[in-house]
Structure formats: C-alpha cells, structure tokens
Amino acid sequence: MFERNQKTIFVLDHTRYFSISSEQYISMDYLKGKPVAESPGSGSSIVGTQLSKSLWTCAVESSIEYCRIVWDLFPGKKHVRFIVSDTAAHIVNTWSPSTQNMSHVSNAMMMVSVPSRSIPQSSDYSVIHGLRAAIEALAEPTDEQLQAAHAGCKRIGNKGRVICITSARDNTSMKSLEDIFNTVLIQQNALVAPPSKKGLQIDHCHLVILNIVPLGVESLVTNRSLLEISPFLNAEIHTVNAPEISDKLLHLIMGHYDLASTTVTNIPMKEEQNANSSANYDVEILHERAAHTKVCGPDFTFTTSIKPGTAYETVTLKWCTPRGCGSADLQPCVGQYNVTPVDVTSRPSSCLINFLLNGRSVLLEVPRKSGTKTTSHMLSARGGEIFVHSLSIARSAMDEAPSITDGPGGRVPDYRIPEMGQLLKMSRLVPLKTRPKGKCSQGEHLWRRMPRYFPRTANATILFNLQRQLSWLPHFLHLLVKEDMDKQDEVRCQQQIHELYKSASRGDLLPFSNSNNARLKVNKTKDQYRLFYRELEQLIQLNAHTPHHKNLLESLQSLRAAYGDASNKSDPSAAHLRSYTESPLSPERLEPTNSVNSSSSSILKASKRRMSGCGQRSLLDIISSAERSQSSKRLDFSGRLCTPLGQTAKLYPEFGNKDKEILTPGVIPSSLKDESIRS
C-alpha cells in the first residue's frame, strides 16, 4: 500500500564549501557596457557581464525541480520534505499537505540564502545533523498512514528515500557517512519498537548520496551502484559536477517513480519576430510509464531516441493537427496520467501548456516509415491539470467480440452454444455440506463420462441435429446416458433402433432441415443412415457401463453388419480410441466392402500371411533382404572378384600397352571365338 517513493527527504549540505562557484559562467549579453577585455591565452572574448551560480544554488534549484515534477504528476499522493543542515538541522516543511507545495518550499529556501564564506571552518558544520533529522522524519506518519491506523490496519508499511546532496573528500569519508546513517537508523527503530510506539518503524530506506564538485574539478569519490548496507538500508553514490546535478536528478526520478519521457515533435508555433511565419518545435514531457505500456497492438513499437546530454530514452510522438471529429472517429481511452514538461520555463513548453489549458486537445501519433498514421495518445487539460490519455490501438473491451467464424480453420458459424450450456449444467458439481464417509467417486465418474463426446459444431454431427425432427430421439438419448438403465429402458431403445432399421430398409430419407442438409452435403439415404449408426454406436460405447448398455451395443453392431456397415471387431481398443478422437463425419477409413472380388481378397490374405511370417523384422530388414536377393541373381564385378582383399582393382589394366595386339574393327580373334564356343 505504501511504496518506497511515498516519502522522499532531501538533505541539503549548508556548509561553507557550498558557497563557492560552480565554475559555469553565464554571459549576460543583454546588459549594456563595454566588452570585457580578452583574457590572456584565450582566443575568444566574453561580451557583457558574466555570472556563475554557487554550489548551493545549483543544489536548491535541482532539488526544487525534482519536487515540482513529483507534485505535478502525483498531486497529494507522494510527499517530499527538505532539511537544511549546517550547525543543526533546519526543517523546511513537514508531511502536512499545507506545506507540500512549491510556494512554501521556495519562500523557505529564500530565507535560508547562500552559505557565507566568512563562516569559520568548524566541525559543528556537518551534514550528519540533517541525516539524523531525516531518519526521525521517516518515522513520523503521514496523513494516509494515520488514516490507515484509525481504520484498524494492523501492519502499516513505512518505507522512504533520503537524497543527500553534499561533498566529501574521498571514499573513506563517504563510507563513514553511510555507517553513521545505518547506526542512527537502527537506533531509531529501537526507539519506536513496542511498547513505546513513538512513531513508525522504518521498514526500509534508500539512501542516495550526490557528491557535488565544481565544473572541471576531479573528485576522489568514485561512483557506486546500489549496494545493500543492511537489511534496512540500501545506498548508492553519484559524483557529478554542479551544473549537471539537474540532469542527474532528472535521470534518477524516472527510476524512483517509474516515469517515462515523451517528446512531442513538429509543434507549429509562430515566431516572435515574424508573426506571419511559423516553425516546428519539440517539447519533452514526463508521465508515468504505464501510459506507454498500456498501448497495445500487433507488432507495435515506439520510436525511441536518446537526447544529447541525457542518459535515458525518450519516445517520439508526432503532433497531429487538431481537427473536428465525431465520436465514431475517437478511439477508446485505456488510461489517463498526469503530465508535466521537463523544461517548464522554455517558450515551446509554455505555449503548449497554455494551448491545452485553454480547452484544446491534441492527438499524438506514432511516426511510421510506411507513411501510415497511428494515433496512440491524446493531450488534454481538466481542472487546471494536464493529462495524457492512452488510446487503444488494438480492439477495445467495449467493442463487439470478434466473430468466432474468423478463425484460422475457416468460417464456423454453427457452434452448439446452447448444448454446451446444458452440458455444463449437467456436469456441475456442488460441494457437500458434510464430508462423506466413503470415497467420493461419483463426481469423478461423472467427470470422466460426460464430456468425452461432444461435437462442437452442428455440421460435425447427425445424431444431435435430428433431435427436433425425430420426436423419440431426445428421450432415447436421455436413456442412453442413464447410469441405472433397466430392462424396460433397454427394450424401448431396442424398439427405436429396429424402427430406424425399417425406415432405412424402406429407403426413407432422414428428416434433415434445409440448412443442415446443405451443410452436411449428404444426399444418399445409405450414407445418411451409415453415419447415423456410426455416431450412435460411438455414443453407446462411451456409456456401456451396464449389461443393458452392452446388449444395446451388440444389437446395434449386428444391425450395422446387416446393413453392410459393420465395424472392425478385431481391435476393440483402437475402435474405442477412435470413438474419442474422430467425428462420424470425418473422412472414412479404407475398409473392404462386399463389392471386393475374391481375387483381391486372396491377395490381401496372402500379403497378410507374408507380413505375419516376418516376425519382429523391421522395415529396413525387409528392404535389405529384398535387395540382397536381387543382387544375387547378377555376377559381381570381375575386378572385385579377382583383386585380393585390401588392394585396389585397376579399371583398364591394358590401357596404354603398345605391345598388345591391336584388334581390327569387325574382326574377332580365333581365341575369342573358341572361348565363346566353349561358354
């Protein structure tokens, strides 16, 4: 409920060191006067008066800018306090909402002023006083924590963050500062422990130390990432130049409060010097990161970039010219978040803020390489606050659900939704008030038996499509799923099956409706009854738990055999498995029919005998033996037969021998004739 960023305390070092210059000079060229003489050894001259901020001014301005962003984005939700430390700790504001505003903090900081350089160097001036006061301030409850305590909350979370802006000599001094802070934190938790209960116990504290040095001065303090000092304390150290402390705090605040940066580009603004012309400007704004993460869509990515001088990414969104559009053109909003500009004093930011506060809205679109436009966000103001609205790019929850017919398998417009609802009602299990003594196997039996066969679509079943046309079929199906079928129910079902057989013998068509008949595309009477019998047998097999069910199944199988559509009884387990996985309207398996002649039957039987005699031989063994039997009928290569093992046979041993007698074409030597005769 209370996160670590709920409480943030700035501890500002107000010692003599912070009165020195930051060494970043600002040229005041608008002041009239003689140019300053060119400094020796430099190739440039500075026109006008030059000013430089002190370390104290840089620290105060950047910390106040930090709290401005927090209060703009989380008004009344996140709290920031300031403590100034010199010879003692000076409390600037409290957790009270009346002091959590910019005017109170600014007026108090003006009264503190810059540290005097005439202050004598003394050990009494230390930032440790402020760190002690910061730990005590973390133990004080906020209004939200007090309300939770009054509401009866037993465990109130209390976490916080302390940002200390100081300057240390080396790593040893910084380590000593961390140890003192950790010791004081443990002592404070011991003071508020029961039974005293003087405040809240600090569950965890995040200490951020910013070591400030003037521009161009190297520090002996090294940067260090987040490190766990104790179970109650994590600390990190950053060494930055005084002019860059504002950018550093801007980078830190994005991680502290999970913020994101958005740069609105191509904002048309008129020039101050020439009102007839306009130029495009960019404005960077901050908001919660969820404003980007809630925008979803297929293959949707934001264009990000890193601005010069910063270490974080910013999302680039393009200004969309305001235009009048109806409600049909607006996308639904999936979230709204407060917005604040990064540079609140710049002219482009001021123009954008005034434009929005005057009641105008701005649409922001994602730039695409393909040239298409995708509007993802909208800026608008209400009640003096500016919000960014995340627009739904994908389908909204308020839109109609996508048609189930547009699936990857094609159009399926006839899902059996009412029948599925009835099946769910039949399969519903209600918990018992008292625990049964025996095993509760009835629910498990129902779970295994009911949903095994359920055609999802109307065009995948014949049996269930005929329930409205055949008056006896609903009652017949009800008797099939009964667990306690008696002899009378069996006789009724037998009668209905025989009546169905008589209808098939007369050649009566099954009473399909026009729509079902068009979908099923089964026009032959024999095909209709064959599919009907197959599905009926499949349903009876799943419910054959009593002798009456088994008798009914045998009767139907004999009827199918008489009709010429007998099932294969040689492998009952395979047939039982196919009853779960196949629909009666699936493509039929190749089965021998009565029209097959005796010769083809004998061939099949002979092939079966040959295959059965193979035993456990694999397909590779069968193919290898067939190749060996074929190769044994031919003589092998003479070179392989005459050459000893391990040697290579020469293909043409007499090639190139000049002494060999040259045979005349068309004349056969007598020796060859004799060999041919003897052979």
UniProtKB/Swiss-Prot annotation:
Keywords of the record: Cell cycle, Cell division, Coiled coil, Cytoplasm, Developmental protein, Differentiation, Meiosis, Mitosis, Nucleus, Phosphoprotein, Spermatogenesis
Region (Disordered): 564-610
One cellular component (GO) term of this entry: cytoplasm
PTM description: Phosphorylated.
Subcellular location: Nucleus; Cytoplasm; Cytoplasm, Perinuclear region
InterPro entries: Cell_cycle_regulator_Mat89Bb
A GO BP entry: oocyte nucleus localization involved in oocyte dorsal/ventral axis specification
Keyword Metal-binding: no
Pfam family, one: Mat89Bb
Span(s) of short sequence motif Nuclear localization signal (NLS): 604-610
The UniProt record lists the keyword Cell cycle: yes
Residues forming coiled coils: 519-541
Quaternary structure note: Belongs to the multiprotein complex Integrator, at least composed of IntS1, IntS2, IntS3, IntS4, omd/IntS5, IntS6, defl/IntS7, IntS8, IntS9, IntS10, IntS11, IntS12, asun/IntS13, IntS14 and IntS15. The core complex associates with protein phosphatase 2A subunits mts/PP2A and Pp2A-29B, to form the Integrator-PP2A (INTAC) complex.
Known role: Component of the integrator complex, a multiprotein complex that terminates RNA polymerase II (Pol II) transcription in the promoter-proximal region of genes. The integrator complex provides a quality checkpoint during transcription elongation by driving premature transcription termination of transcripts that are unfavorably configured for transcriptional elongation: the complex terminates transcription by (1) catalyzing dephosphorylation of the C-terminal domain (CTD) of Pol II subunit Polr2A/Rbp1 and Spt5, and (2) degrading the exiting nascent RNA transcript via endonuclease activity.
The family this protein is said to belong to: Belongs to the Integrator subunit 13 family.
Protein name: Protein asunder
Organism phylogeny: Eukaryota, Metazoa, Ecdysozoa, Arthropoda, Hexapoda
